[in-house]
Structure formats: C-alpha cells, structure tokens
Amino acid sequence: DRFEYIYPNYLFAKEFNISKDKNKKVSFVSEGFQKHYQTNTYEAIVVNDIKYNTNQKIFNSGFVNDFEFLIRNVNSDSENSSNYKKDVNYEFLSSVLFKTSYPLIKKGNKNTKYFSPIFSAKYSPNQTKDISNEDRYISYENIFLMDRFGKNDFVEGGQSISLGLEFNNINNSDGRNIFNFGVAQIYRDNENLDLPEKTNLNQKTSDLVGNLNIFPTENFGIEYTFAVDNSLDHNNYNFVKANLKVN
C-alpha cells in the first residue's frame, strides 16, 4: 500500500544591520522539511542561507544599484528519491547578483511616467543541479531575482546577464499604476543543459518574457503575461487575466 507522511516543516529568519548604513543588511534564513511518500521514498532537507544585500542605492549619476551575495548550505538525507542524492549529503554553494537600472522620469500634471533600462549579472562557481525535467519557466516578475526558479535547494551555476526595459505610468492623484509594461531576456556564454527547456532557459539566449498591465479605472484592469521564443517567430506562452471589482 502506498502512503504519504509529511512531518511539520520549519522556517526561521533573522535580519542584521552590520553598519550605520541601513541599506547594508545581512540576513539568515533556515528552513527544512522531511516526508515519506510512495511507500519507500524518504526525503529530509535543511537549507541555511546567509545573504548580504545592499538594497537599492541611488547615485548622483542617476543609476540605481542593488548588490546581493548568497552563501547557501544544503543538507539532504534521502532514500529512493529522484530529487536528491542517496543518503546524507552536504553542499556549500555561493552566488552573486548585481543589478542596475537608470530610471528616466517625465512628470506631467496628471501622470508621472517612468522608463527604466535594466541590467543584471549573475555568477556562481558551482554546477547547477539537474532540474531539466522540471516544469519551470521564467517570467518578467522573477527574471531579475537571485532564486528566479523558485527553488532554494540549489544555485544557478555559471554566469549570465539579463537585459530588460520597464515603463510605468502613475496617476498623480492616487498613486495608481494605470499602465505598466516590462520585457527582459537572459543571455549566457554557454548552454546550461541542467536547466529546463521551457522558455529556452537552457540555451544561450532565453525567451523574451514580459508583461503588460492596464488599469484604466480603480475597478477594472487587464493583465497580460507572455513569452516570445528566442527566435522571435512565435509565442511560447500567453496568459490574460481580467480584474473586475464590484463595490
């Protein structure tokens, strides 16, 4: 008989200020779980992260920079698992992320418009864990994040850069973002076949991902998310959502 037994998981997080500059912070996050499933499969995972983050720093030149450094300790114990190595294993991983943008602002009587070219660079000396068979993809919402695959038990190995553009139109009277458009793409020096094929993440050039959000009123809006193939000749993903608020 098959059964599944999931033990309680845990999450602990603590943030430290390491200097008088409140923009420079160190955080510690520890989380873990263990479970039995499919009769004889066992997984126990503990992940400890130490992260240094400068948050956003605005320079006189107009550039907005953000720097992040991650040290990750992954501890696993498993039997008959397709996700983790057999028995007890320990890994120490590291990754660094630098992001910069150059916001351009045009203020009007009714609206304020922001146009921002965005650049980020990631590097890790570690090899990527094989997640090529997992159903994961990149969106504009996560493409510039450290853990952009939504997993905390590995780091993305090698080096890559991400380039993007973002436009926002803000209503001055209520601060509402009435029009937002963002688009971005990942570039690598080498293929990374340990990453999923979806949205061409394992290729030198990923899909062009983006979103378009229109909120003409407080009660109605349309959100469009897309991924254009890296050959730019067809779409690999489209999703449209309408929001209607009734008072």
Language-model segments: what does each one mean?
Residues 1-247:
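Outer-membrane beta-barrel proteins and related beta-barrel translocases across Gram-negative bacteria
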